[in-house]
Amino acid sequence: MKSNKTMEKKMKMSKCIKGIKETPIDLQFKEATARVVYQQYEDVLLNLALVSFNEQRTVLSTMDGLQKVRNVGNVYVPDPLSKRHMTLQSYDQFTQDLPITLGLCHSDFIFLSTGVNMECVAVCEKTYGNFHVCCIATGGARDNALRMGVDAGNWVENKTQMQLSSGTINIILLTNATLTCGAMARAIMTATEAKSAALQDLGYMSTFLPQVQATGTGTDSMIVVSGVNPDVVVKHTGGHTKMGELIGFTAKTAVTEALKKFDNM
């Protein structure tokens, strides 16, 4: 339990810059700064977990692929905004306009989207030797949990309209180690397995087929951010590796906490 003095200090650190209110997210990971940013977009107040670095980082995103950027984020899109922009065409426009609204360069910022408020964000960090892994997650799975390989999909790209559900499990993984492209891809697999383990431990069942265990939601996404330390290079992030263990532990812990916060599990 955090003391009142700690909470007061956090509140004092909240600030307004050019009309944007920011509340810091405490990280032991010193290579990045993280905060929840509140921003008016059109006539709706949204918020996002924004993680920034001093230099460009190689990142692998399930939304944008392999990129080099200084900023990554997880954006809460409230329902009124979701109804306007969560179709394929209008979402592309949203991804172009939001960085401008935030005062960020579009080419230096990639983000995920969710119907989960960033006030329900969860963080887990773990170290081993010279490895440091940090997971920042949000999660909601009451409305669109599914079991992959069992549940049916109903959206056909370019033919039918897709709407963002109020759930979604989004993960941002940070590490100080320089990850190869293969290690970043395997990290997504490792963290996804950990996410499914969190759902299993919490007893989530498919929303559409309640008799089967859920493995995720239909809109989950992830960003993996590589470190830049040339002396700490990691090629393998599977479950038998120490780096894989750190990724799995932090992802499972953060996702579990995030789901408890938003879904009251």
Language model: regions and residue ranges:
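Alpha/propeptide regions of enzymes that mature by internal proteolysis
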Residues: 2, 7-265
